[in-house]
Regions:
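ATP-binding/phosphotransfer module of carbohydrate and carboxylate kinases, centering on a glycine-rich
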Residues: 1-76, 83-150, 260, 268, ...
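General beta-strand structural signal in soluble alpha/beta enzymes
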Residues: 71-72, 196-201, 235
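Short coil/turn connectors at secondary-structure junctions
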Residues: 87-89, 194-195, 217-222, 231, ...
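Short, acidic, Ser/Thr-enriched surface-loop or helix-capping motifs
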Residues: 107, 164, 236
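Hydrophobic "anchor" residues
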Residues: 112-113, 169, 241-242
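Glycine-rich phosphate-binding loop and adjoining helix at the ATP-binding site
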Residues: 116-221, 353-364
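Acidic-glycine-rich active-site phosphate/pyrophosphate-binding loop
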Residues: 184-186, 243, 250-257, 362-372
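Glycine-rich phosphate-binding loop of actin/hexokinase-like ATP-binding domains
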Residues: 219-276
Length: 406
């Protein structure tokens, strides 16, 4: 029983129903969307789910009568806000990076997110990240009082292209020497049996996190650029992640900027990542300070901190990189014409230094109508910071009415 006396419903019984009737599918969609975005309005539910207002209203009314939904009208707003009633369940999102694993978790009936991250060495191999991720999930749920036995879904973002049809990894990030074969969800079965595991590229999930909870909220087309050790992107069109046929959508780091340029680990030459990847930026700082300073930054994060404190070399290297990224973004804009570009990853932690030179690069080659109109494409910093991927994984897994297995 809940504190109000109503019978508490297990969220899994609402989501894991076998019926594929139109009515039951729509019911699950509405429940999932309300869990993913607590307090969403009925108007937004219809828009996000591509359902009619009448269909959403009927489903919400039925769920309200059952005590599963609470519906409130707030002054000055269009549409009633929908929140869960006495429903018990936990949603989890995981992001695996080159140097860090992050986990976000929360109850499905609240927007309060618990978050934890840990250092992780990618050279530990492709087998350790599943174990470390599972351990971090368990630690976070214990520390915060969340019931691990009531997890309804786990979204997992990894630095790899993932085939959206099978959840199989098609290619790991060029900077990682990982051999990931087989089904990624299956790797989690020893730790979380019977829990749906929804796997995708970590930049895709970061894009979805900003779209659902952050800087991209309310935008129709959002391009998220993750600039850290490597460079990736995620594209949201009409609330959906664009992945492409084989999961390679968003590989902005491998746009060819110079056909005769530096060899890239992907096998090509002159990729954007060879010009603005973390290793290249650190090398430029080392070259600039050769013979002058020994206490050089060892990470992009360290470069950013020095630039913020006034280090002219770090600032110049970072701003030159931002301008180059802007040049590449002009190509993407000319093809996709996004409404909003969000800068995330490590470089997203210094918007005050990098957004302007990035926009300068974009303006050079983007079509005039996109940058000079009354409603130009905008570049903004991330609202969610380094938590974007884990939070997006959490939200997307809740929204997904399926488990993809190999």
């Amino acid at each position: 029983m809940s504190s109000t006396g109503a019978t508490t419903v297990d969220a899994r019984s609402l989501l894991w129903t076998p019926s594929d009737s139109v009515k039951d599918v729509n019911r699950r969609k509405v429940i999932r969307a309300a869990m993913a975005d607590p307090g969403i309005t009925q108007v937004s539910l219809a828009k996000r789910l591509l359902l009619s207002q009448g269909t959403v209203s009927a489903v919400v009314s039925e769920l309200q009568q059952e005590g599963i939904f609470r519906v409130q009208s707030e002054e000055g707003e269009r549409g009633k806000r929908v929140r869960l009633g006495a429903v018990r369940g936990v949603a989890v999102g995981v992001e695996v990076n080159h140097d860090r694993i992050a986990v976000a978790a929360r109850r499905v009936d609240t927007s309060a997110v618990e978050y934890e991250s840990m250092s992780f060495r990618a050279d530990q191999g492709s087998s350790s990240w599943v174990r470390e991720s599972a351990n971090l999930i368990k630690e976070l749920t214990v520390q915060t009082g969340l019931d691990i036995d009531h997890i309804v879904s786990i979204g997992v973002g990894i630095p790899a292209a993932v085939d959206p049809r099978t959840a199989m990894v098609t290619q790991v990030a060029a900077s990682l020497d990982w051999d990931i074969t087989g089904s990624v969800p299956e790797r989690f079965r020893d730790h979380f049996r019977d829990v749906p595991i929804i796997v995708d590229n970590e930049a895709n999930y970061a894009a979805y996190g900003e779209y659902l909870y952050g800087a991209g909220r309310g935008a129709g087309t959002v391009l998220f650029v993750k600039a850290s050790v490597g460079l990736g992107a995620g594209l949201i069109i009409g609330g959906l992640i664009y992945r492409g046929r084989h999961g390679y959508g968003g590989e902005i780091g491998h746009l060819t900027m110079d056909p005769d340029g530096i060899p890239c680990r992907c096998g090509n030459r002159g990729c954007l990542e060879t010009l603005v990847g973390g290793a290249r930026l650190l090398e430029q700082v080392r070259q600039a300070y050769a013979g002058y300073r020994a206490d050089l930054p060892t990470s992009v994060e360290g470069m950013i901190e020095r630039a913020k404190r006034g280090d002219a070399v770090c600032r110049r290297v970072l701003q030159d990189a931002a301008r180059t990224i802007g040049l590449a973004l002009a190509r993407v804009c000319n093809l996709m014409n996004p409404e909003l570009i969000v800068l995330g990853g490590e470089l997203g932690r210094a918007p005050e230094l990098l957004l302007e030179p990035m926009m300068d690069g974009l303006r050079l080659y983007a079509l005039r109508g996109m940058v000079d109109s009354k409603d130009p494409v905008k570049i903004v910093g991330s609202d969610l910071g380094l938590a974007a991927g884990a939070r997006g994984a959490l939200g997307f897994a809740l929204m997904t009415d399926r488990t993809v297995e190999a």
